[in-house]
Structures are given as C-alpha cells and as structure tokens.
Amino acid sequence: RCTLSLPSAPNQIDAKCGTLIVPENPSIPDGRLINLNIAVVPAISRKAEPDPLFVLAGGPGQSIIEIFPAIYPILFKLHQTRDIVLVDQRGTGQSNPLHCLNANDKFLNNDETIALLQSCPEKLDADLKYYTTDIAMKDLDQVRSVLGYSTINLYGTSYGTRAALTYL
C-alpha cells in the first residue's frame, strides 16, 4: 500500500504500489535489469469493470505517479467503476530515472549548460537506446499482462497521446 499525494493538490489517494523488473534491453532477458514503478488505484465500486484505465503522462519525461493527484479530479467518475493503473515509463519517476540536471544548474550560463548536456549521456546509468516510446509501450503491455488484465483503456495527454497510439 502507498499514498499518492502532491503538496499542490488536495487529494491523497490510496494505491497498491510496487515494481516490475524488466530487462533494459528487451532482446537480452538475462542482461541488465531495471525496475518499473507501478501504482494501481483500485476502483471505488466493489463491482469494478474488468478493463482498467491506464493513464499515460505527458512530457516525455513526466512521472505519472507523481502528477496523478493533480489530474485525479478529472478521472474521478471513471474511477468509480474502474481500476486506474499508473506506470512510470523507463527513465521517469522511480523507473530507473534519467537525470543530469539539479536545482543548482539553473544558474549556469549558456556555455556551461551546453557542456553539461553534452556530458549527460555518459553520466547516466542507462543505455539510452532502450529508452524509447516503442519499448516503453512494450513494458506497459507486460504490466497489463502481469496484472491479469485482458483488455485496457488508455488515457493520455500531450506526449501520452502519442504513447497511446504507439501502444495501439
């Protein structure tokens, strides 16, 4: 169990949270492994529909689990009868996050910023060629399967709409 919340949103949402371990390179199942951060917000009704709502974040780069409390009010009616499933795509949130910048970096000049961004890939604990929309949507389908859902509904905004189209 976990509680999803944001300082700027009044909602505190109870969820079931966990991780799914997947290979960073899907072609090498016994290679380097990464964790996908997952939260399932169970339907309010005891007679939930069998097809949950998977919510996809914008960005790319947003953590859906982190921002969900802010968008929950628009999904409240659907939540009455459907589980809501949140998966931080690889490289976002707590799913092997890809971060090079920190709060102090906002004070860098242009040359320093360019140098920092150019050195970023070598500093990351990731092989970036496996952090694509196609692979992230294969991860999403693996989450669907592991959770036992045969069909799902997708909801995305901004980049999440592109990700949803890739999934379909």
Regions found by a protein language model. Give the residues of each.
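Gly/Pro-rich cap/lid or specificity-loop segments adjacent to the active site
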Residues: 1-168
